[in-house]
Amino acid sequence: MEGMLKGEGPGPLPPLLQQYVELRDQYPDYLLLFQVGDFYECFGEDAERLARALGLVLTHKTSKDFTTPMAGIPLRAFEAYAERLLKMGFRLAVADQVEPAEEAEGLVRREVTQLLTPGTLLQESLLPREANYLAAIATGDGWGLAFLDVSTGEFKGTVLKSKSALYDELFRHRPAEVLLAPELLENGAFLDEFRKRFPVMLSEAPFEPEGEGPLALRRARGALLAYAQRTQGGALSLQPFRFYDPGAFMRLPEATLRALEVFEPLRGQDTLFSVLDETRTAPGRRLLQSWLRHPLLDRGPLEARLDRVEGFVREGALREGVRRLLYRLADLERLATRLELGRASPKDLGALRRSLQILPELRALLGEEVGLPDLSPLKEELEAALVEDPPLKVSEGGLIREGYDPDLDALRAAHREGVAYFLELEERERERTGIPTLKVGYNAVFGYYLEVTRPYYERVPKEYRPVQTLKDRQRYTLPEMKEKEREVYRLEALIRRREEEVFLEVRERAKRQAEALREAARILAELDVYAALAEVAVRYGYVRPRFGDRLQIRAGRHPVVERRTEFVPNDLEMAHELVLITGPNMAGKSTFLRQTALIALLAQVGSFVPAEEAHLPLFDGIYTRIGASDDLAGGKSTFMVEMEEVALILKEATENSLVLLDEVGRGTSSLDGVAIATAVAEALHERRAYTLFATHYFELTALGLPRLKNLHVAAREEAGGLVFYHQVLPGPASKSYGVEVAAMAGLPKEVVARARALLQAMAARREGALDAVLERLLALDPDRLTPLEALRLLQELKALALGAPLDTMKG
């Protein structure tokens, strides 16, 4: 490993670099950040990597016989740099000085105190606001998938039957880091596909089975525990493992989450989550995300959620008061985890105290029935123990309040007396020497000193010992000052030690309330989500959905689009029907499809919905094929992706599913497209799925299906061009207005004119061809045709139907 230093020189490694190499050998997959005074340094290859990543100047560590590249970051900016490095894909090993330099005998002792990877973070400043999952995937009896959020202790997993279901769950949870079992890491095809779909850090861990259940899941659980224990130094604070069944929630494939922009925008910045997120706490925000990932299927829990939201809708003053108080709360869920792991800082306990001071106000607003645990004894202890604004680190000192610990108070009193000596010394020496500008100062190099300016050098007593000469002043010390200084230092060390002891005692007592804190965080997160959904409902005019056997939406709106533009509401009524929607591009067909799905999704989350009235069935899944999502990098055309998504819909959708299809078949020839679209429409009609099918194929509007309904999006040609009304009306569209939309898009006038001429010619040709076919058929006597004549007749009719070749049409 010494070779990684890329050093030059004949001599042995200096002790500092020997210590660096020894620690670096223990963590070969990590970038070692090695504390040297006020900086974290890297040496050799790691220094070059750090300098490249952060744009730092590369310097060199030089000793008598050895030189190596060096780069570093200041301790005070560690978190900002660490966040950047983690996002770039680095794993970080942080080696801190674990003893004061002045107390070290020789080389300062250093230990790796933190291992930081994207999926195992505990530090609030480095964590995202959403859940921070570490995932593990193993094979066996299905696909074993497990998730762990180290920051909250959430620990869960499932077994999936297909790779597509696995990918859906990964997209739904969006882990920050993934552990892959050896058989997957060695599978080149799988690895390539996985990396293209999920650009997250991939890590290795032993996949030894853990717990009960299917082998694949047990292996995934074991990998999470092994990896997390290594990064956390063996200490974990976990909730009991929970097996979850994705089938217990509304099915939302990856294509649906993408098309509906639930968490990630296709364009712009707004998503369904962003327009709903009026939460005031971090746990509330994470809970809202979880609800959106897992819409409910059972009416009872849904109605219970809606009752709570409605309560806050009706009680505006209560809603406002609760939200105002929630805004002041710390992230109690993550704070409880840091408490249990012994990682809570003085600042954490200060934030906990402020949060606990808010709980009585919340209880007074909401009543005892809300079920918040009584944490007043802990609040009172923290109020008594901690200063008003505790520092981030214990080593900074000054965190325990005066009067809390008698031993600490006595040490502080003695220290004040020691410091007072130097203040008295300044006055005494001024009088004794007659030097009016004499003053006592302090710095870290010389300790306490007496400072005299140039005009009074001749008055300096002989017993003054010079320690530093500056441009216009000199600094001195006295033997008695050194004795007092040593005593002050000794007392400061004792104060630091006692403060740390007291802090650890207080933190240990707070740790005993970690489970109660988690319970409080859970209750408050739910209240936060209910109040947030109510705030959205009141502010934007949402209504409570009603559940039944039909879908009936009056004046429905798109919850995201209406925030950024004036929106035209629309109605929809259907029951196990196939609804065909025709109309020109840009008229709003896709928006209408999406708004219907979003209203259904919101209803099964437990939210009010953007409409004047909404009656909905309980859907078991929402399936979409909306818009082109090319996978050209993966070797798949738009049409191939479209067909794969349609295949999944036809495989999984039931009569209780909501299916949204937009322009199925457009990625191939017109004849093929019509054939495919017709077959898909017939299959979904037969299945009785609630299907909204937007299409330009007018042939579909004439399908003789009993449960088919035609709608169209209104548009009209006016003098200034095509006008879109964005209204969804009964019946099929009269025409597609493709040429008019092309003109609006800015195609050259001569191209538009040529397109109109071709369109008219083709329409005339088609009409003439149909007349010719009809005339020929009426002249036939089928009973007198031989098989050979019938075959020739079919060929003739086909030629008549096709009409003249396109290239015979001249503009």
From Swiss-Prot:
A biological-process GO annotation: mismatch repair
Keywords, sorted A to Z: ATP-binding, DNA damage, DNA repair, DNA-binding, Nucleotide-binding
Keyword DNA repair set for record: yes
Cross-referenced CDD domains: ABC_MutS1
Keyword DNA-binding: yes
Residues binding ATP, per UniProt: G583, P584, N585, M586, A587, G588, K589, S590
Gene Ontology MF terms in the entry: ATP binding; ATP-dependent DNA damage sensor activity; damaged DNA binding; mismatched DNA binding
NCBIfam families xrefs: mutS1, PRK05399.1
Cited PANTHER family: DNA MISMATCH REPAIR PROTEIN MSH1, MITOCHONDRIAL, DNA MISMATCH REPAIR PROTEIN MUTS FAMILY MEMBER
Protein family (similarity comment): Belongs to the DNA mismatch repair MutS family.
Function: This protein is involved in the repair of mismatches in DNA. It is possible that it carries out the mismatch recognition step. This protein has a weak ATPase activity.
Protein known as: DNA mismatch repair protein MutS
